[in-house]
């Protein structure tokens, strides 16, 4: 069935890396709502910076936390309003009104399914199944004007940008086949040290030492000694198992135990980069 409205979901911690460069071309001519999910994991200053940047591009952003339900009602109302606008245009062309069909799109693991579940829980009435190409697709009526497809569309992440690939890995937004936890954790520790000097990132000075009671030293050649830090942290916390410590560090970030951290800020704001290499996946 033809889709009229696309609800694009991105990860609020990495809004650029979870935006697909070809999406605007794919959805040309359709209404578009941009959602930044996991707002609770990003500092308010970073949210304000991103909102201002998107506003300057003529794009309204809907900040949500699908897990807690924050911002979901406002998103639902915005989608229903978009449906009403589209039907007003149809009426102006002498066409009969019909429920507008909306599809939710986004990279893997950015929270599309959780968001759909939140929206569906607030549904007004459930509509009938309509045959899809390969399986039955269920449409859920969210208002008099709007039907939402209850299966999310998945955009393929592109790993040709190594810094974006690292951020996707850190946020658990790409498959683990593309990276190893130890390498990702070492890059993350290095990135955290660099982010200490970036306003609005949410990274406090000495974050790793404060959290794990292990100081992050400097290499003689310059730069943080992340391998030495990981080995010492493993001795203290995981019985000397570096891989388990690496996994713990990544999990602590992904579960917000390190606090709210923005890994990306709007274009024009200098952000640090670290040397990484990821496998390229076909898109």
Regions found by a protein language model. Name each.
Residues 70-72, 107, 112, 133, ...:
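Gly/Ser/Thr-rich helix-start
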Residues 1-6, 13-33, 39, 45, ...:
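Helix-rich effector regions associated with P-loop NTPase G domains
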Residues 101-121, 125, 151:
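Glycine-rich phosphate-binding P-loop
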Residues 95-97, 118-119, 140-141:
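Solvent-exposed alpha-helices and their adjacent loops that cap or buttress functional pockets
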Residues 74, 78, 114, 187-190, ...:
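Alpha-helical scaffold segments in soluble metabolic enzymes
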Residues 27-28, 55, 120:
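Short conserved AdoMet
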Residues 86-90, 117, 123-129, 198-200:
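Short, structured loop/turn "capping" segments at alpha-beta junctions
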Residues 33, 39-106, 124:
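Canonical P-loop GTPase G-domain recognition
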